[in-house]
């Protein structure tokens, strides 16, 4: 019940802002750009393709193989649920600093705009995406 109430306050634009922040620098150390085939595999009801793995190194030839550990397809509600899990005062996913950014975004929410995604930096966006993908923080 409470989870649904929290999730309903996170707008589609809030989710997109979190994903954009993560893609711009939050997840780039553990995730790589999806291929056309991975994008094409997007199931109905899912909006985002997150590939856990590494791309070939742009300079060093000895590291020229793309490695994929998993391909994760997320819906907006998957991201909302991860945010909700991280908002919980008793959460054990992240340290107090990252938790504080998430709390600040919730505290400064408005009826019209949802949460204040301006508080979600690359580190916070990273852990939101990790919890959405893996239900844990594996990296960082």
Segments and roles (model prediction):
Residues 98:
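A motif-centric signal for short, conserved binding hotspots located
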Residues 1-73:
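Long, contiguous N-terminal structural blocks used for assembly/anchoring
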Residues 21-25, 29, 85-93, 108-113, ...:
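Surface-exposed polar/charged interaction patches
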Residues 12-15, 76-79, 122-126:
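Alpha-helix initiation and N-capping motif
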Residues 69-95:
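Long, low-complexity intrinsically disordered regions enriched in Ser/Thr/Pro/Gly
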């Amino acid at each position: 019940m409470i989870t649904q109430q929290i999730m309903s306050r996170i707008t589609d634009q809030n989710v997109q802002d979190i994903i954009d922040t993560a893609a711009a620098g939050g997840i780039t150390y553990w995730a790589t750009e999806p291929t056309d085939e991975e994008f094409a595999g997007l199931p109905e009801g899912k909006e985002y393709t997150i590939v856990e793995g590494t791309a070939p190194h742009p300079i060093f030839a000895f590291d020229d193989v793309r490695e994929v550990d998993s391909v994760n397809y997320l819906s907006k509600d998957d991201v909302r649920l991860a945010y909700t899990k991280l908002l919980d005062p008793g959460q054990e996913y992240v340290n107090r600093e990252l938790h504080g950014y998430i709390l600040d975004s919730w505290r400064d929410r408005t009826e019209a705009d949802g949460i204040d995604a301006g508080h979600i930096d690359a580190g916070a966006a990273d852990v939101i995406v990790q919890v959405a993908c893996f239900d844990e923080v594996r990296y960082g």
